């Protein structure tokens, strides 16, 4: 047995999955920089737009969004699981007690062989699994990494809710602005049509001019219902993100207030590795990979012996035939071990499954990193082109 234990302890573990390609993707990424390279990420990024309505909507979404609240409950669940797994590292202590009163009902002459007894017993039980090969520690580490991944996922849910509220709010303001512009244009068309009809009555315009003016008015009026629908549906989507029913109006989205689009502040992206490190989904994937690695260590430790320490300390008060005896103290200390010898390959299959899950998690992490690089690059390119388009439109209007 000692030879088996020493050989198992000296065995070198597998180095785990190869994530060098994912790390290289972070290190070699060269994002196109827009503006300054400096600056750290502001968690209250929406405040840079200086829009109190947007700030109020984002704050409410972070508190009331259902996805955010669901993620928060998962964090509580994962933390409870982490606490439960860590408890395996500590000994257990229990208090036991019992009282018994046994009467035979026989005459006193026969009570020598069947005496009446009354007993009071109390004891302390101590149990501890000595974590020689780290199975309990690996289980606790896996649960702790799961809790960290849940916390990162919750942060990602808050970030997603905030960004979606901001995007929909800007879309709502833009739709209202286009609606206002079309309504002003429609009023101008109506005035023009009335003027042309008046000129026709005076013989200064033809029926063709009237028909053309009416067609232009109707064409412009036909574009208003889709814009009004867009304003309404966008407001409904914002209500849903805030955990409200679409039938409940949002006082903050007051259509009587003139629409406006805020100025887009400069958003310095920072360094590539810093940009990716800000993403909660990547941090969650990395923590999940660490959890799977801990489960591999746990599965390998299950192939090795397990050692247990048990102790019992107690006291007993005994009365026999109404005669009290002296209190008795007793104790029992035992050291035990168990080692799997044959289980039809169950433990080895569990190790293989954990190893495969770790490799799959490493691939998912690599895919998430590469996808994040693409998303950031695409966003920066789109931002640069939209700014160029806005400058070109401003130059065209100034001519």
Predicted segments, located by residue:
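Short terminal targeting/anchoring segments
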Residues: 206-208
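Amphipathic alpha-helical coiled-coil segments
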Residues: 70-85, 157, 161-193, 198, 220-228, ...
């Amino acid at each position: 047995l000692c030879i088996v234990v020493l050989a198992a302890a000296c065995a070198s573990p597998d180095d785990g999955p190869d994530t060098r390609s994912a790390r290289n993707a972070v290190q070699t990424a060269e994002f196109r920089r827009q503006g300054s390279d400096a600056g750290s990420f502001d968690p209250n990024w929406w405040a840079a737009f200086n829009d109190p309505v947007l700030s109020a909507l984002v704050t409410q979404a972070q508190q009331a969004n259902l996805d955010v609240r669901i993620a928060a409950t998962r964090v509580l669940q994962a933390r409870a699981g982490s606490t439960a797994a860590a408890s395996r590292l500590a000994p257990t202590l229990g208090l036991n007690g019992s009282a018994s009163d046994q009467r035979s009902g026989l005459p006193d002459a026969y009570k020598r062989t069947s005496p009446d007894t009354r007993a009071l017993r109390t004891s302390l039980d101590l149990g501890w699994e000595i974590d020689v090969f780290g199975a309990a520690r690996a289980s606790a580490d896996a649960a702790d990494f799961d809790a960290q991944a849940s916390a990162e996922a919750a942060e990602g849910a808050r970030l997603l809710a905030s960004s979606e509220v901001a995007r929909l709010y800007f879309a709502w303001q833009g739709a209202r602005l286009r609606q206002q512009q079309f309504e002003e244009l429609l009023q101008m068309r109506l005035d023009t049509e009335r003027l042309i009809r008046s000129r026709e009555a005076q013989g200064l315009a033809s029926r063709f001019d009237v028909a053309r003016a009416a067609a232009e008015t109707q064409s412009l009026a036909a574009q208003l219902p889709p814009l009004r629908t867009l304003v309404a549906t966008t407001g409904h989507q914002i209500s849903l993100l805030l955990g409200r029913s679409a039938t409940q109006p949002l006082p903050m989205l007051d259509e009587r207030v003139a629409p406006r689009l805020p100025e887009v502040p400069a958003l310095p992206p920072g360094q590539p590795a810093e940009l990716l490190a800000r993403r909660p989904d990547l941090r969650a994937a990395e923590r999940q990979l660490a959890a799977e690695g801990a489960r591999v260590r746990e599965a390998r430790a299950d192939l090795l012996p397990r050692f247990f320490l048990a102790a019992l300390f107690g006291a007993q008060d005994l009365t026999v035939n109404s005669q009290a005896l002296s209190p008795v103290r007793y104790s029992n200390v035992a050291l035990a071990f168990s080692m799997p010898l044959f289980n039809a390959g169950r433990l080895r299959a569990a190790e293989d499954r954990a190893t495969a899950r770790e490799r799959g998690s490493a691939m998912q992490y690599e895919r998430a990193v590469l996808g994040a690089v693409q998303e950031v690059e695409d966003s920066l390119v789109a931002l640069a082109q939209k700014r160029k388009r806005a400058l070109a439109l401003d130059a065209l209007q100034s001519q």
